[in-house]
């Protein structure tokens, strides 16, 4: 074996300094015949160890046992006993939610489908969107809400409380509704591809903390991940990267072909899954800049006769589509029409950020 030493210099981005490193992920070396040489990367050595900050422990009270904080609680020092965290759930609207959350509840050893234990009842009440009330007494638990979101968040609050108190709940009342209309989470699936399974896992975490907007970043310089009928080759050609692929290795992807895209059926599946968690899915199609992958497949979207050579903050050259071309507007009309039909949410995010000044 031949030992090769590589000295890596940490680059400092314009938005700040990274204090951690994953090392030379994706590194590969070719011989003069462009054949890949087998590598064994030994343990990295660093000049100094990064010390992570220690954070103060938050005091333990009821509002810190449910995240986000509940708006109003009134509990006594008495408890409703719940042997083995078993509940009897009979209301159809509550059962619908509990069935969907069963895999998560199984992991937490919470059973909403027992033949014995406190009964969970539901009563409709005129409340605000996503607002709910819970009454806990020795006779059982009653949930009050006006819509699906209120019922769903009431169950989520019970899951948090049961996980904390274990086999009992304090008697009393809860009144709660979200502090903000928009409670979002962003996931960049362009720079790194995430499977449908992983996205659903993130959505479950979002639902457990009452977030209601999934900002799905589907396109950027590095890939176009959304499969569209109007341009069937776009995602299939730009969503994979690797050596001698249309999109070169990026972000540690390495020599082999890797990546993926989301079919229309997968998108519909994710949207339906998110709705059961009271989450709306907002797609982001990043334009007019951040479009390097797009322009590799559809070079007619920028003007080849122009002598302008732009470069963005990520060192991508000519990554901006040209709004003065008829082909650009035809493209925009086609994709917006199809995306609007595919996604049920009323907003499409179009980026409009970091356009190179010379573009």
Predicted regions, residues:
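Acidic, contiguous N-terminal accessory segments
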Residues: 21-178
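Short beta-strand segments enriched in hydrophobic/aromatic residues
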Residues: 10-12, 287, 354
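Intrinsically disordered, low-complexity Pro/Gly/Ser/Thr-rich segments with frequent PxxP/GP/PP motifs
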Residues: 1-16
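Beta-strand secondary-structure signal
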Residues: 7-9, 119, 142, 215
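Feature activates predominantly on carbohydrate-active enzymes
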Residues: 137-329, 338-349
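His/Glu-based metal-binding/catalytic segments typifying zinc-dependent metallopeptidases
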Residues: 335
């Amino acid at each position: 074996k031949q030992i090769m030493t590589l000295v890596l210099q940490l680059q400092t981005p314009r938005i700040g300094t990274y204090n951690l490193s994953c090392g030379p992920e994706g590194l590969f070396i070719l011989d003069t015949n462009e054949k890949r040489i087998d590598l064994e990367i030994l343990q990295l050595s660093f000049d100094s160890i990064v010390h992570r900050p220690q954070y103060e422990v938050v005091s333990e009270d009821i509002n810190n046992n449910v995240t986000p904080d509940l708006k109003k609680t009134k509990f006594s020092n008495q408890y409703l006993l719940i042997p083995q965290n078993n509940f009897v759930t009979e209301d159809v609207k509550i059962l619908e939610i509990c069935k969907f959350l069963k895999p998560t509840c199984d992991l937490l050893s919470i059973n909403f489908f027992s033949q014995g234990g406190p009964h969970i009842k539901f009563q409709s009440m005129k409340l605000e969107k996503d607002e709910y009330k819970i009454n806990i007494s020795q006779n059982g638990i009653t949930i009050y809400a006006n819509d699906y979101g209120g019922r769903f968040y009431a169950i989520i609050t019970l899951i948090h409380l049961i996980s904390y108190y274990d086999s009992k709940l304090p008697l009393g009342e809860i009144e709660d509704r979200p502090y903000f209309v928009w409670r979002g989470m962003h996931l960049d699936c362009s720079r790194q591809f995430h499977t449908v399974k992983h996205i659903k896992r993130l959505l479950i975490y979002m639902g457990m903390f009452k977030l209601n907007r999934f900002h799905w970043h589907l396109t950027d310089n590095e890939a176009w991940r959304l499969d569209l009928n109007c341009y069937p080759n776009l995602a299939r050609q730009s969503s994979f990267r690797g050596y001698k692929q249309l999109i070169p290795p990026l972000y540690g992807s390495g020599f082999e072909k890797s990546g993926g895209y989301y079919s229309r059926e997968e998108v519909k599946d994710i949207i339906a899954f998110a709705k059961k968690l009271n989450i709306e899915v907002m797609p982001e199609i990043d334009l007019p800049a951040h479009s390097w992958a797009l322009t590799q497949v559809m070079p007619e979207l920028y003007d080849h006769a122009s002598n302008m050579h732009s470069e963005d903050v990520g060192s991508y050259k000519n990554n901006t589509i040209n709004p003065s071309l008829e082909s650009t507007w035809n493209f925009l009309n086609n994709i917006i029409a199809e995306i609007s039909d595919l996604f049920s949410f009323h907003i499409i995010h179009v980026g409009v950020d970091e356009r190179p000044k010379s573009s």
